[in-house]
Regions:
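Residue(s) in the substrate-gating loop at a strand-loop-helix junction
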Residues: 141
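Conserved glycine-rich cofactor-binding loop
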Residues: 15-16
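Active-site helix of classical SDR
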Residues: 118, 157
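Conserved glycine-rich Rossmann-like NAD(P)H-binding loop of the short-chain dehydrogenase/reductase
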Residues: 29-45
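Active-site-adjacent segment of SDR/Rossmann-fold oxidoreductases
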Residues: 146, 167-177
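Substrate-binding pocket helix/loop in short-chain dehydrogenase/reductase
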Residues: 94-95, 99-107
Length: 239
């Protein structure tokens, strides 16, 4: 990559939490497209990062589950060096408690939207893959490794995301694209607050990973030398 052509990264879920932390980690190295639903929050992150590094930052406000809107939003991207899927949703409940609507919503956001965005961006990723390499990082979950009681629909969507990554990795290796699944344990985010409230516990963010720690794992996958492929990363809170 020449000095006149900085690599470009697109991050979904970039308006808060892990996605925003990833954006901060990548800003010194990449031009950024910040994806998310909340235009005001995206603009706030973009304003924070603009001027903090040498790269360009722009926002892409779109509902990932709206296929037509998503296709339109991504249509102009001709080359993409890194795609980080950080957007996701989580709703807990036993199988008995969980309606079909909840199952569909979690799979739509956590799996189908990821697959569709990736499919639309494959030509741009392959363009970079054939010219130095490209990366796709799926911010998954510990629930994509182990399913616990009350986590059935969420864990099932994350197991499916892991399977998607495994298939994609094998399919795109010949195009110079690496695919990494990052499986964090509990992270100090708004989603984690909702989880703890659902469990009836008292929230103590110091017990959990910081979003910046997960973002560091994402950066490690992206910056690994091209002879190395970090296929899966497990990140757990200390203690």
């Amino acid at each position: 990559m020449t000095a006149s052509h900085r690599p470009l990264a697109l991050i979904t879920g970039a308006s808060q939490g892990i996605g925003a932390a990833v954006a901060r980690q990548l800003a010194p190295r990449y031009d950024l497209i910040l994806g998310g639903r909340d235009e005001d929050r995206l603009a706030a992150v973009a304003d924070e990062l603009t001027g903090a590094g040498p790269g360009a930052v722009r926002t892409l406000a779109v509902e990932l589950t709206d296929d037509e809107a998503l296709a339109g939003a991504l249509a102009g991207i001709e080359r993409l060096d890194a795609l980080v899927h950080s957007a996701g949703t989580g709703e807990l409940g036993t199988v008995e408690e969980t309606s079909a609507a909840v199952w569909r919503r979690q799979f739509d956001v956590n799996v189908v939207a990821v697959a569709e965005a990736t499919r639309l961006l494959l030509p741009a990723l392959r363009a970079a893959g054939s010219d130095g390499g490209a990366d796709i990082v799926l911010v998954n979950s510990g629930a994509g490794i182990t399913a616990k009681p009350g986590w059935g629909s969420y864990a099932a969507s994350k197991f499916a995301l892991r399977a998607f990554g495994d298939a994609l990795r094998a399919e795109e290796a010949a195009h110079g694209i690496r695919v990494t699944s990052v499986h964090p344990g509990r992270v100090d985010t708004a989603m984690q607050r909702a989880v703890v409230a659902h469990e009836g516990g008292e929230y103590d963010g110091s017990r959990f990973l910081r979003p910046e720690s997960v973002a560091a794992a994402v950066l490690a996958a992206l910056t690994a030398s091209r002879d190395a492929h970090l296929t899966e990363l497990m990140v757990r809170p200390q203690g």
